[in-house]
Amino acid sequence: MTNKFKLFIMMMVASLPAAAQDKLSLIESRLEKAPVQEKVYLHLDNNCYYKGDDIWYKAYVVRADDNMYTDMSRLLYVELVSPDGMLVERQTVVVNANGNGEGSFVLTDSLYSGFYEIRAYTRWMMNFCVTEHPSNRQSRELFYNRQMASDFFRLYGTVHSRVFPVYERPDEKGEYAQKYIVNRPKSRIPKELQERLRVTFYPEGGHLIAGTKATVAFEALDEEGQQVDIKGTAAGKTIATEHEGRGRFTIDVPDNGNLKATFLFEGKEYDFKLPNIERFGCALHLTDDKQKAVAQLHIRGAQLNADYAVAVLSQGVLKDFQRFRPDSKGQAEVTINKGELPSGVSDLIVIDPEGQPMADRLFFVRNFDYEQQLITVSADSIDYSP
């Protein structure tokens, strides 16, 4: 479940009156009135830099609902972050009436080479898509205070971010043929030992629901965090990665017990437990083409003689809200018209009769509505004279 909409919907439900009207209607009404988000894009003057260079940038700040220049924020914060995740410099940029701003960073010789990050955000963007990364006491004690540690392990999904290499300055001016990066000074931060193979599973819709058929995506990483291609088995079926360490498979989820997958990597066999099976919830499978997206739903362990809803959000705005009632087997099918959605990523959320999110799924829409129109130029005369 994406954090921004799960948290947003739960906050709305918590504020509903006890003697509620139709909770689905209230959810729909509040989603329609959801605050408009902002988006930022930074245009840099280059794709890579050398120590001693200047990084010039131009910023574009737009409203997420229509991609027009923002009329909300007038201050933009732009940060340069070192390869080890520490803040090098933060700049405050004034956003003009056209949603633009500009500035530059100096890559001083005191910095070391490596992959740097530049990120940009407005204060308003900090209200959306917040994720707290898990951390232990040992890692938090590496910071000067709790606030620094909290900021380091907090991720804002709406922040614009771009990573680029910074190379060592060449020995002779103008000799840029050889680009090299010198390893940064060694730190004494203890490195946690990692398994040689790590596999993470992502059930479609967010959960494995007992007694349903599920599609499960997975990603395989080695001890250095690099994606690797592997083969294995799950529930008697052969599974394998399809591209850059990622793959998917379908599985019949049993009513009881646990599921596991077994992989062979570099001569060693690894067993991984799939996410816990839940007795109550909604299994979601989405099929889509150019015209429509069809959500196949299977609800288990919940009341069936009640209305549920599917909400579709794009650009932070509610684009579709459909009610449905599952059949006697708990199954239902909801069709989304993709022609009515803007190009980009949309989020489909299944909501129960109490207004709580049950499952969600991202899907992509490409309607070519951002393509620039051709301009035709014609003259009113064949010849012109001074």
Locations of regions flagged by a protein language model:
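Bacterial Sec-dependent N-terminal signal peptides
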Residues: 1-26
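A structural signal for beta-strand and strand-to-loop patches characteristic of beta-rich domains
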Residues: 22-386
